[in-house]
Regions:
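Terminal amphipathic alpha-helical/low-complexity segments used for targeting or macromolecular assembly
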Residues: 1-17, 22-23, 28-29, 65, ...
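Structural signal for interior beta-strand "rungs" in well-ordered beta-sheet cores
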Residues: 8, 13-199
Length: 267
């Protein structure tokens, strides 16, 4: 093509077998491995590494310090029958996120829409993030996990392998989803779910401790769990008891707001 990609504020290391479009933008210290493809309009933040045979296409913005491993495919059109070729949409990925081998991330199905992944996430090999998903900061997706369209995942949630998640489902902050689960409904923050279909089994105590949630707040969350799931109430009755008997606290407030906003119901 005779042109070289635009490099912002410093040199990039591009393997001679890689194909980088002249209208891609590479930050300082970016490394692009053998046979990788970086398409038109892709923007890579400082220090990001792209492994061999990875394919990055379309309106794709990758933050600084990310690592994209071999065979990952990011920014391709959504697997949506309503999709029309040429619809302007994209993918945004935050800083210091790790994307392992053969992960697939599709761009939004909506005009000027975005599929969004936050900072410091870890997407393990072969996991999939579909169009229009919103993934928070510090989220871990383990291998063979699939997020379908419009799924939302809260900060520091952990989703174990071979989990299938229905379109439009929301997974709350610091939730833990056990392996081989099926999620047809929303998962409230802080809880541990497992099964096909998934059921709440308890509180994600290990995750709460690792996140530095104070002991008093963990006890409040455990009380909320018992009111919601172990007191024989309907979800609405349990939620009302949580509202009136617990808090106010940032953790209980977030739990109540999440459940109250659910359109699909909660597991």
């Amino acid at each position: 093509m005779g042109e070289t990609p635009r490099v912002i504020d410093g040199p990039a290391d591009v393997h001679p077998t890689a194909i980088v479009h002249p209208k891609a933008e590479l930050g300082a210290g970016v490394r692009v491995g053998p046979y990788a493809v970086v398409g038109k309009g892709v923007r890579l933040g400082d220090g990001t590494e792209v492994g061999p045979h990875a394919v990055l296409e379309g309106r794709l913005e990758v933050g600084p310090g990310c690592r994209i491993f071999a065979g990952a495919v990011i920014g391709y059109p959504p697997q949506d029958l309503k999709w029309k070729d040429g619809t302007p949409s994209g993918v945004r990925i935050g800083a210091r996120t790790v994307i392992r081998e053969y992960v697939t991330i599709h761009r939004s199905s909506l005009e000027d829409g975005w599929t969004v992944i936050g900072d410091e996430c870890f997407l393990m090999a072969t996991s999939h993030v579909a169009h229009d998903c919103r993934v928070g900061n510090g989220v871990i997706l383990t291998s063979y996990t699939g997020l379908t369209g419009f799924v939302q995942v809260g900060d520091r949630a952990f989703i174990s392998g071979l989990t299938g998640i229905h379109q439009f489902v929301r997974i709350g902050t610091l939730a833990f989803v056990s392996g081989c689960s099926r999620l047809p409904q929303d998962v409230p923050p802080y809880f541990l779910v497992e099964g096909n279909p998934a059921e709440v089994r308890g509180v994600n105590i290990v995750g709460l401790r690792r996140a530095g949630v104070p002991a008093a707040a963990r006890l409040e969350i455990q009380r909320a769990y018992k009111l919601l799931y172990r007191s024989g109430h309907t979800p609405a009755q349990g939620l009302e008891r949580v509202r009136t008997e617990l808090g106010p606290s940032p953790y209980i407030d977030q739990l109540v707001e999440f459940i109250a906003a659910s359109r699909r119901g909660i597991v």
